[in-house]
Curated annotation (Swiss-Prot):
GO cellular component term, pick one: postsynaptic density
Species whose genome carries this gene: Rattus norvegicus (Rat)
Gene3D superfamilies: 1.20.5.1700, Pleckstrin-homology domain (PH domain)/Phosphotyrosine-binding domain (PTB) (2.30.29.30)
The protein, known as: Homer protein homolog 3
Keywords: Coiled coil, Cytoplasm, Phosphoprotein, Synapse
Length: 358
């Protein structure tokens, strides 16, 4: 059967063992890690198989027959005999639930294999829903106890109805297997996988803790910088009343300058009227003096207007600077609150990590 073309009916992961063909007593593990074990339907031969691939070779390629029996020898270990392959397979699962699921699926596949055999004998064809036709589980074969109730093994019959000699040979092979040793080996490999996962999780936690500590230092430095900035801005805000007094004095100076400008404008206008109005016996020297006074007043007036505009500009800049300082203080305070909250979260995370570390 080509597993690349067929989809598995059911798949799980387990540590795979085979009975030692030389001693018929010890179990040989297929590897240090759990392998994928799947049920497949071979449509070409109209049979069901249990397949497990390790690397580039098939570790398990067992055809399920109606006479096979899957026996649970512990809470996490089960086994079955394959007379065609002349071996016994053992599976060590990570949990009792996985073992129960595999055993239930074994019963369903065995029933489907029985239906497939009956249909083949009747000349019919097995449809793709043969597995779903299994409505009842076939009771397991009687158990044979050789060393007490804790070491129950099963009696498996060949699909081709082997004789008493074959059955006795299988019974002897199974009875001589060290069930306790297999259970311990399965538990050992399961613990190895668990330890590897825990070690990886611990390394990730340590890396995360280091990263959190670095982030904590960065946050602390940034928070300290923000505290200094807030202190500077608060000092600037505290100095605002003094600046406010200066601004009031500036405003008064502006008002005085405006009054002086208006007065000078009036004087200029009066002088212009005098210079252009009808006069008796005008004197050239007096007229020139008057014109010079007018020019001086106009020059002074222009200077006053320029000073007024400069002072108004300074006043607006001072007001804008004050508003910017207030806004910057508000933003810095908000950012400081956020950083303090993040620091609190980092401390809580480090505390939880320290409690969880062994």
């Amino acid at each position: 059967m080509s597993t690349a073309r067929e989809q598995p009916i059911f798949s799980t992961r387990a540590h795979v063992f085979q009975i030692d063909p030389a001693t018929k007593r010890n179990w040989i593990p297929a590897g240090k890690h759990a392998l994928t074990v799947s049920y497949f339907y071979d449509a070409t031969r109209n049979v069901y198989r249990i397949i497990s691939i390790g690397g580039a070779k098939a570790i398990i390629n067992s055809t399920v027959t109606p006479n096979m029996t899957f026996t649970k020898t512990s809470q996490k270990f089960g086994q079955w005999a394959d007379s065609r392959a002349n071996t016994v397979y053992g599976l060590g699962f990570g949990s009792e639930q996985q073992l129960t699921q595999f055993a239930e699926k074994f019963q369903e596949v065995k029933e489907a294999a029985r239906l497939a055999r009956e249909k083949s004998q009747d000349g019919g064809e097995l449809t793709s829903t043969a597995l779903a036709m299994a409505s009842h589980q076939v009771p397991p074969s009687p158990l044979v106890s050789t060393n007490g109730p804790e070491e129950k093994l099963f009696r498996s019959q060949s699909a081709d109805a082997p004789g008493p000699t074959e059955r006795e040979r299988l019974k002897k092979m199974l009875s001589e297997g060290s069930v306790g040793e297999v259970q311990w080996e399965a538990e050992f490999f399961a613990l190895q996988d668990s330890n590897q996962r825990l070690a990886g999780a611990l390394r990730e936690a340590n890396a995360a803790a280091t990263q959190w500590r670095q982030q904590l230092e960065v946050q602390r430095a940034e928070a300290e910088h923000l505290r200094q900035r807030v202190a500077e801005l608060e000092a600037q805000v505290a100095a605002e009343p003094v600046r406010a007094g200066e601004k009031e004095a500036t405003s008064q100076s502006v008002e005085q300058l405006e009054a002086r400008v208006q007065t000078k404008d009036q004087e200029i206008q009066t002088l212009k009227n005098q210079s252009t109005g009808p006069r008796e016996a005008p004197d050239t020297a007096e007229r020139e003096e008057t014109q010079q006074q007018v020019q001086d007043l106009e020059t002074r007036n222009a200077e006053l207007e320029q000073q007024l505009r400069a002072m108004e500009s300074n006043l607006e800049e001072a007001r804008a600077e004050r508003e910017r300082a207030r806004a910057e203080v508000g933003r810095a305070a908000q950012l400081l609150d956020v950083r303090l909250f993040e620091l609190s979260e980092l401390r809580e995370g480090l505390a939880r990590l320290a409690e969880a570390a062994p």
